[in-house]
A protein has these predicted regions:
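Charged, low-complexity intrinsically disordered regulatory/assembly segments
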Residues: 129-193
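A short acidic, leucine-rich amphipathic alpha-helix
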Residues: 44-48
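Short alpha-helical segments that sit at the start of domains
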Residues: 2-28
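Amphipathic alpha-helical dimerization/coiled-coil segments
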Residues: 84-143
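Glycine-centered, phosphate/nucleic-acid-interacting loop/turn motifs that mediate DNA/RNA or nucleotide
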Residues: 67
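Short helix-capping/hinge SLiMs at alpha-helix to coil transitions
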Residues: 23, 34-37
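Short, cationic-aromatic polyanion-contact patches
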Residues: 19-23, 41, 72-96
């Protein structure tokens, strides 16, 4: 199971939905909508993902086709369609899945991982130029632990419990707060032998 975000997540197990999501622009759109709760037009979306409004309009329609987003109330004259997410996150379910679903899930996870590696590289490149309080605030850790399945579940639940109040859409953050990408992996390594 892979989670894009937690909270009120939509569970996805259908290969066609996973394939529809497995595009960097669509992932970026979904991440923005899920994390902010915002509603967005194709023109605004184009600025966000660096594509033309017609290209982003196509991506928005594809996301709507699978009910990942929906039309939001108009902002005024109704000439532009406004879109919003139908959930606060996505959970990719593969338990008991057939080979097509497993393949689609792996392709989708590859898009997530490529994006996360790119973000980590960008952080390392710009870290020396960050203001002093932020320069050492972030970090990356890679380690192995010896734990039971229950201990790993407990650890994951505790991390989610720590993070959730900070990512709450309605949180009144201090003025010096910035958006931060928080990513962690916790999975059993392949057993030797």
């Amino acid at each position: 199971m892979v989670a894009m975000t937690d909270g009120q997540s939509r569970r996805i197990s259908e290969p066609q939905v996973m394939r529809a999501l497995a595009h960097p622009a669509r992932i970026e759109i979904m991440e923005y909508l899920n994390n902010t709760g915002a509603a967005i037009t194709a023109t605004e979306c184009a600025e966000l993902v660096g594509l033309s409004p017609s290209a982003t309009s196509y991506h928005l329609r594809e996301l709507a086709k699978y009910k990942l987003i929906e039309e939001a109330p108009s902002r005024g004259d109704g000439r532009e369609r406004v879109w919003r997410s139908t959930s606060t996150g996505l959970r990719i379910e593969t338990e008991g899945a057939d080979p097509a679903a497993i393949s689609a899930a792996l392709a989708l996870v590859d898009v997530f991982l490529e994006r996360d590696v790119r973000r980590a590289r960008e952080w390392v490149e710009r870290q020396p130029d960050e203001p002093e309080p932020w320069r050492d605030a972030g970090g990356m850790t890679s380690l192995e632990m010896l734990v039971t399945a229950e201990e790993l579940k407990s650890l994951t639940a505790k991390i989610n419990a720590l993070v959730e109040p900070l990512r709450a859409r309605d949180r009144k953050a201090p003025p010096e707060a910035r958006r931060v990408h928080f990513n962690y992996f916790a999975f059993p390594v392949e057993q030797e032998g």
